[in-house]
């Protein structure tokens, strides 16, 4: 997966990295692509003539521009206001570089960055609460249906065609649709308007699923399924839009700054997953009325969307992110083969991660009942899931803490390895620890830690870093949609295996996709032509980064992206 820049000095080798030109100390950001040739083309306009040269394997490039004088002064194009003031004081360059239809002189006059809102850092309030809202609404479906099964009316309906599994499936089907459509709208009409639309759908879907589901058990589940589909479209759209908005609002082109902002936005994922169980515990301890409990649980999901709807209207956005021509934008999204290759590192890894993560997380009530037995009370099951999901909090924040140290690639790699090993370990000890419920719960907590420690963060970050701004939201949505496809497959697969084969085969099947994703991460995330020895040095050297006080970046010099 190519990083955001590389220099003209590396054009012949295709090696990617954020380095300076061999002819100059200046860096230039030139987003010019020729999708048909699957390469970058930089156009130079020396007076009346025109020169072009190709630069492969990169979305942006860096070239020196000479003023033609005796001193051989070079001029940065784009860049910060200070750099552009220096350009003005030296005089105009002899070559005019066209960037997205603008010459370097026009860019220098406007002082606008190629990306972002003119370098102004934006608040993380909307992305953070949007992520919280999305994960709350995805998770609350499972716990609400679990509570509904305590009532014979709904329990009998769950055994029909429109059972609880169908309601969950409709929620995730809506999410897949929302991720693709809202991600695309984020590029077409802008991140702000698309976010406003997604929040409106979340509010409507959550509210209607709470107040409109009345009647017999089957009718309630049918209405709830339709409403959760609408909510899923909105909640799914939150994923690409919140990640891209957080990254582009960094006020900086540095991938470290962007990745940290996206990771902090994603940190609301764990509270969003955990909060439905806390609300359910309070409600169930207050009243054992199933109707009251599940309706308040579902309706609460509308509140975060309502709270941030007005701040979303006030979000600032650069017009450069809005597609001017619908047809050209549509063609540009799907024409480049390099984008689809990058999906192996973003979308397919996300798919494999969600097979494991959602397969385990959303059947945790069933897993805990298989550990403790069906005699556990509703309160016990809720407490057990609060404890399990609570392990995600240190996992998530420890992952964020070492993100800069380890780098996105190796944090994802070791996250997948840790998740696979912990799942296999739990599978191997099920028979040994039979009857020792708390020992099995500890192992399940370790699995939950690795679910949130590595790949959970990086799969959310990567699409917002590696794709160019014109298609960033679209491909972030496609990557997230692939993840939700994996989630749907994981839910059905893990639940079926758990009910037929037990916990041991289920945990084995949960570990295999993580192992496959670790292999894909090695080869398709930031691929750099290193020797095998160098790659292993980077890989195992990055383990030192798991300690926040040790700088392991010197071990990863051959892997320059996302540092």
From Swiss-Prot:
Residue spans crossing the bilayer: 128-148, 169-189, 193-213, 218-238, 264-284, 292-312, 343-363, 381-401, 413-433, 441-461, 478-498, 505-525
Gene Ontology CC terms, in alphabetical order: plasma membrane
Keyword Plastid attached: no
Top-level taxon in the UniProt lineage: Eukaryota
One Gene Ontology biological process: phosphate ion transport
Cytoplasmic side: 149-168, 214-217, 285-291, 364-380, 434-440, 499-504
GO molecular function: carboxylic acid transmembrane transporter activity; symporter activity
Parts of the chain on the Extracellular side: 1-127, 190-192, 239-263, 313-342, 402-412, 462-477, 526-563
Reactions mediated catalytically: phosphate(in) = phosphate(out)
Annotated localization: Cell membrane
Region span, Disordered: 1-51, 67-96
Membrane topology designation: Multi-pass membrane protein
Annotated function: Inorganic phosphate transporter. Activity is likely sodium-independent. Exhibits higher activity under acidic pH, implying that either the monovalent form of phosphate is the preferred substrate or the transport activity is H(+)-dependent.
Record family assignment: Belongs to the major facilitator superfamily. Phosphate:H(+) symporter (TC 2.A.1.9) family.
Name of the protein: Inorganic phosphate transporter PT2
Lineage of the species this protein comes from: Eukaryota, Sar, Alveolata, Apicomplexa, Conoidasida
